[in-house]
Amino acid sequence: MRVCTFLFAGILCAQTPAKVDFGRDVLPILRQNCVSCHGPAQQNSGMRLDRKSAVISRRGVVPGSSENSMVFHRISGSAFGMQMPPSGPIRPEQINVIKTWIDQGADWPDSLANEVELPPLNSKAVAMVEALRTGDLPGFMKSAAADANLLNARGPEGSTPFMYAVLYTGPATLARLLKLGADPNKRNDANVTALMWAATDLEKTRLLLDHGADVNARSSDMRTPLIIAARRPGNSSVVKLLLDHGANPNPNAHPAAESSPLIEAATAGDFASMELLIGRGAEVKASGELALEMAVGMGCSKCVALLAAKDLDREAYSAALPNIAFLGDVNAVKLALDHGADVNAFDPLGRTPLMYAAASDLLDLDVVKLLVERGADVNAKDVHKEGGDSGLTVLDIAKLHGDTPVVQWLIKSGAKGTSPSSPVLKARRENTIQSAIRGSIPLLQRADANFIPKAACASCHNNSLAAMATASARSHGFQVDEKTAAQQVKANVFGLEKLRDYMHQGFFVPVGDLFGPVVVSYMLVGLDAEHYKADLNTDAVAMYLKAHQSPDGQWAYPAADTRPPICSDYIGQTALSMRALQLYAPKTDKAAYDRSIQLAAAWMATARPKNNDDRGWRVLGLAWAGKDKLATQKAMRELLAVQRADGGWSDLDSMESSAYATGKALFALQTAGLSASDAAYERAVRFLLSTQQEDGSWYVRSRAMAFQPYFDAGFPHGFDQWISAAGTSWATLALSQASPARMTMAMKGR
């Protein structure tokens, strides 16, 4: 489930070698981008890409001929179906590596052929892990004392009970287990060791190192303990400990594709870790472009200055500029331009830095002005081919946010638009809450079921929100397709299971993991709505979330994702992550998770919303926290104050009211206790009833800069269907929460 890696991946610093080495150059690309859907767990379209015989025998790869190799065609274009991976194409440099390798004869060493089936899991080891998860430490220790060999036996995903003890117990217990013979260097099926799982905890890391743990062990996904330690905010003490024990600060040949400790420290916005790494020899130029993007995204000015002082290549600044422009940091944009960044360069998706600046919800006029002053073409056209923004000009993109100062200034500067066609909409003339929900649920469930098989991943917009809406409708007496609902729960859990080992390492995607918390938190909230019981998968998400929380209590999420509103939530990520911990925190460390929840609630109480989307999330987060009534009431008043005369809300003040913003705002207010008799409540309900389409959907215009190849998931509204599905889910959630006494409330005429 590689959702967003492409956005943050840079250009490989080294040219494709004359002779491509499979283990060094090809295998990491396959593991990070393909094997989750075409590996031992599942083989989409019958293709398995982790085993030599399966790839060669089915002509996935024809040695010597990329032209006749299906793998090459599927990753390089859409002639044989949607370009793979479904979450977004890999970079041109990586495609060229695969092509060159095939044309050179596809040399795949037998030592990496992966032809031997893994041994079965040990049922006793699996039972020991379950004992740990449920808090039965005495039972676990009894089993270990009876047969110490079980500590090193194959448990879930090949991980040993001792590895799981690293997650669920403390240093004292681990010391006892090591004395019994636990092996700190035993590897699971992904070549992960106990030290990698311990690398976010100083004392556990110290203990394992003292008992001979390999400080430079590397997983199949090219991660080392140091890479994992550097990703956690405020974890510089562990970074230093690992470096002191000989950890390599430059473990990967291609850090822009495989990550590096420096990139992860920048992603965490951790200046102390970055300074340590650079002081110990971390190669700044090799990681510079991506590290620069991450440091700017996290708002760490000291981190940016540290990198800029290292004389990065002009190409690094050029590659980073599009995402930096989107972040609305005029000083960072100036820094990139002053270091030679090409102001008119198209990124691999076919867009210029000015397009990203125009697309940002931050509406930063100073950034737009600076780019134009430095020569940006105000009439450049978006040449991205796989989304609804293809062919749009800079002005078209800016207008997606309404009539803003950015739009007005661009027009004065000579920017031209293309007058994109408006959708043909037909709202219901008569509607009730009951008929509205009965009309929307079948659409949501259909799109929910269609999305995962086509995308090979679960989404917030089509899956998690649909689960929440479906469960809410059911709980209020509406019929839903129970077979589809159960099927989707299984699909979401399977997605988490594939990610479980990633999350134990503290990652959701291989590189640039800024948005992972919002995605997996949505998944847990959706699963809870369907009454899913806690298990190893939900525990892994909770551990991942806890490891990513910043010391001040937030889950830091700058506007670093070009898919507003869903993945650009300043306050929303913290609200959702906190809620996920409330619902699924592991039993074994309740006090620590309670502290994380309290810290998040305190942060939200003082957080300052940047827009209406933030205001809605702040109300919802504080209502979920349930601790600070005064802060919750104040947040409710602030949200109510920006309700429009038509009864709706908009994400931004410059935009029209939408079902997405209105449904979410009303649901937040309902959760916080807004009375159904309140006039604002009634106006919001009437807005939703009056804007539902005859087919049962609500239409929301997308303003996201697409990076995933578009496909039809069976929801109305074409290129705008994914955000429209999300808006329909929020509207359905809000309407289904209406009290029974208001269920027949009707809207007639317009």
What are these regions (language model features)?
Residues N122-A127, H245, R280, V304-L327, ...:
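Ankyrin-repeat-protein effector appendages
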Residues L150-L151, P184, V215, P249-P251, ...:
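Ankyrin-repeat inter-repeat connecting loop/turn
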Residues D136-A144, G170-L178, D201-D210, G234-D244, ...:
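Ankyrin repeat structural motif
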Residues K186, P251, H339, N344, ...:
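Preference for long, amphipathic alpha-helical scaffolds in soluble/luminal domains
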Residues C13-P138, K142, P156-T160, Y164, ...:
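Aromatic- and Gly/Pro-enriched helix-to-coil junctions and flexible linker segments
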Residues V3-L12:
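Sec-dependent N-terminal signal peptides
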Residues E130-G135, Y164-G170, W197-L202, I228-N235, ...:
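Ankyrin repeat A-helix N-terminal signature
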Residues L121-E130, A153-Y164, R187-A194, R218-I227, ...:
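Ankyrin-repeat boundary/"N-cap" motif
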